[in-house]
Regions:
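Short intrinsically disordered, low-complexity coil segments enriched in acidic
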Residues: 1-5, 95, 131, 164-165
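Glycine/serine-rich phosphate-binding loop and adjoining beta1-alpha1 elements at the start
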Residues: 1-77, 81-82
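Fold-independent oxyanion-binding glycine-rich loops
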Residues: 15, 91, 115-116, 149-151, ...
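Glycine-rich adenosine-cofactor-binding loop
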Residues: 46, 62-67, 71-103, 107-115
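Short, charged/polar "capping" segments at the starts of alpha-helices
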Residues: 117-122
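Rossmann-like adenosine-cofactor binding region
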Residues: 124-179
Length: 179
């Protein structure tokens, strides 16, 4: 648990999001009294070890979350990312965090596709078109950046779908990021 909470064993080395989630969950559980003495001791040790790993090493020096890393990639590739059409595949917390970060950076041409049409509830100021997977192939033709954050056994976007979209787009490049 200490390895995960400290960011040593996470998707992005040094990621701080997991540590924050761990602390929040632990404190909520402790506040409502569902954590026993042993788990309190264990959780406090995890927090102590995680803080020590961050302060005594460079692990958290330039750490980003998975969504932050995706946004950094978008900014590195596109000169004007706010002019690009973005398609977010998925509607879970990671997808919602990606959408929130995109909006914070002025990128607001965002559409969201999910297995079932699910309203993404972030903030009333975010206007996001939501659609089902059936509309995915049509949306690809108008999309410059695809950020997928859906857990699935099989690929949601296949080679043929990308080739068809590129043909329709007259080979205008697309960035596909799978989180």
């Amino acid at each position: 648990m200490s390895k995960v909470a400290s960011g040593i064993d996470s998707q992005v080395l040094g990621e701080q999001e997991i540590f924050g989630q761990f602390k929040t969950a632990y404190r909520k559980a402790k506040d409502i009294g569902i954590v026993g003495r042993e788990l309190i001791y264990f959780s406090e040790k995890v927090i102590e070890i995680s803080k020590k790993a961050r302060t005594q090493t460079n692990i958290g020096l330039n750490s980003l979350s998975v969504s932050g890393l995706a946004l950094k990639l978008v900014n590195n590739i596109f000169e004007n990312p706010q002019d690009q059409n973005v398609l977010v595949v998925g509607a879970g917390s990671l997808a919602q965090n990606v959408i929130k970060r995109l909006y914070e950076k002025g990128i607001d041409k965002i559409k969201s596709i999910n297995r079932s049409i699910k309203k993404i509830k972030l903030n009333d100021s975010y206007e996001i078109f939501s659609g089902s997977l059936e509309s995915l192939h049509n949306e690809l033709e108008h999309t410059d950046i695809v950020i997928a954050s859906s857990t699935t056994e099989l690929p949601i976007i296949g080679k043929g779908a990308v080739e068809n979209a590129l043909r329709t787009r007259k080979n205008k490049p697309m960035l596909l990021i799978d989180l």
